[in-house]
Amino acid sequence: VVYTDCTESGQNLCLCEDSNVCGQGNKCILGSNGEKNQCVTGEGTPKPQSHNDGDFEEIPEEYLQ
């Protein structure tokens, strides 16, 4: 299971592919074999294959209002 990049703040917002934002308290699981990405309960987690300062991406402000 691979998660999308999440915000560095404690907001627990994860940005799925296609700009799908999982709400607070949820994380995104990338779909495989043509399945769509899913938001499931759980704190957001950065992609496990990279552990750099650049792991995090800002959530567009329109999603934070």
Curated annotation (Swiss-Prot):
The keyword Cell membrane does not apply. Residues 55-65 have a biased composition (Acidic residues). Keywords: Disulfide bond, Glycoprotein, Protease inhibitor, Secreted, Serine protease inhibitor, Sulfation. GO terms for molecular function: serine-type endopeptidase inhibitor activity. Residues 39-65 are annotated as: Disordered. Glycans are attached at T45. Residues 1-3 are annotated as: Interaction with thrombin active site. Disulfide bonds join C6-C14, C16-C28, C22-C39. Hirudin is a potent thrombin-specific protease inhibitor. It forms a stable non-covalent complex with alpha-thrombin, thereby abolishing its ability to cleave fibrinogen. This is Hirudin-3. It comes from Hirudo medicinalis (Medicinal leech). It is found in: Secreted. The modification Sulfotyrosine is found at Y63. It comes from the Eukaryota. One of its GO terms (cellular component) is extracellular region. Belongs to the protease inhibitor I14 (hirudin) family. Pfam families: Hirudin.
